[in-house]
Amino acid sequence: MFNWIKTFMLMAAITALFIVIGGMIGGRSGMMLALLFALGMNFFSYWFSDKMVLRMYNAQEVNETSAPQFYRMVQELAGRAGLPMPRVYLIDEAQPNAFATGRNPEHAAVAATTGILNILSERELRGVMAHELAHVQHRDILISTISATMAGAISALANFAVFFGGRDSEGRPANPIAGIAVAILAPLAAAMIQMAISRAREFEADRGGATISGDPQALASALDKIHRYAAGIPFAAAEAHPATAQMMIMNPLHGGGLANLFSTHPATEERIARLMQMAQTGQYPA
């Protein structure tokens, strides 16, 4: 129930951003059009955003024949978690990373890059996929997929406001500086909405993944290795669609400044420390 409340609040907050930007572009008429657009986007995001994200990353579905060891690993972990078998995808990218998507456990998918399969041991990879299945178990995947889709749409709409100008509430041409401000601040506002739900969600998925796999130390080792390797390997699809970065087990984006300030992922060192404490004491710290 709490996840449905979070989903509703996320949709409401991002819809409000759409309306504000619509008002900047076209006054009252723009606000109404933006509201209709936001409602349409919410509907689309619920039903189709998982397919869109998988297409963005050119993810290829695999099965027990094409990737037997990886597929059976996910199958075994899904059984341990009491989940239906998700669809399994591989992404031909060198950067080690993984994510889960879908609107519910019955329509879930997990995806991993070829890079993560190449650098992790079987035990570490098992920890990563258990983490992704924990997102499915906690029903986080709908929230993360919707927020990624809607945040991308907000950025596009804000850029539209800059290039095509706008109208105030009386229908007069809007201040162009205000349009530029919207283009800068609207994506940041969308990122902050994502941050409000993403960081705590990653800690919970670490705890849940360690419980599913029964091996918190393996996930800690995997996070350390992914963090070190990912920093030196660009991920073109993620850079092209930065709003989807919060879906990944590790931030795939490069660069400093705002990219780090508004990171939707908690510090890797803290994630590892919590998992190591769980390995030693059997309890994940609050």
Curated annotation (Swiss-Prot):
List membrane-spanning regions: 7-27, 29-49, 146-166, 177-197
Which keywords describe this protein according to UniProt? Cell inner membrane, Cell membrane, Hydrolase, Membrane, Metal-binding, Metalloprotease, Protease, Transmembrane, Transmembrane helix, Zinc
- What are its GO cellular component terms? plasma membrane
Give the membrane topology, semicolon-separated if more than one. Multi-pass membrane protein
UniProt KW Transmembrane keyword: yes
User: InterPro entries per the record?
Assistant: HtpX_protease, Pept_M48_protease_HtpX, Peptidase_M48
Predominant location category: membrane
| Intracellular or extracellular location(s) | Cell inner membrane
- Where, by residue number, does Zn(2+) bind? 131, 135, 202
Q: Name one GO biological process term.
A: proteolysis
Q: How is the cofactor bound?
A: Binds 1 zinc ion per subunit.
Secretion signal: which residues? Answer: none
Annotated active site residues, numbered on this chain, are 132
The cofactors required by this protein are: Zn(2+)
Molecular-function GO terms, alphabetical: metalloendopeptidase activity; zinc ion binding
- Going by the entry's taxonomy, the superkingdom of the source organism is recorded as Bacteria
EC code(s) of this entry: 3.4.24.-
Q: Which HAMAP family match?
A: Pept_M48_protease_HtpX
Q: Which family does it belong to?
A: Belongs to the peptidase M48B family.
Query: Can you name this protein?
Result: Protease HtpX homolog
Native source organism of the sequence:
Ralstonia pickettii (strain 12J)
Gene that encodes the chain: htpX
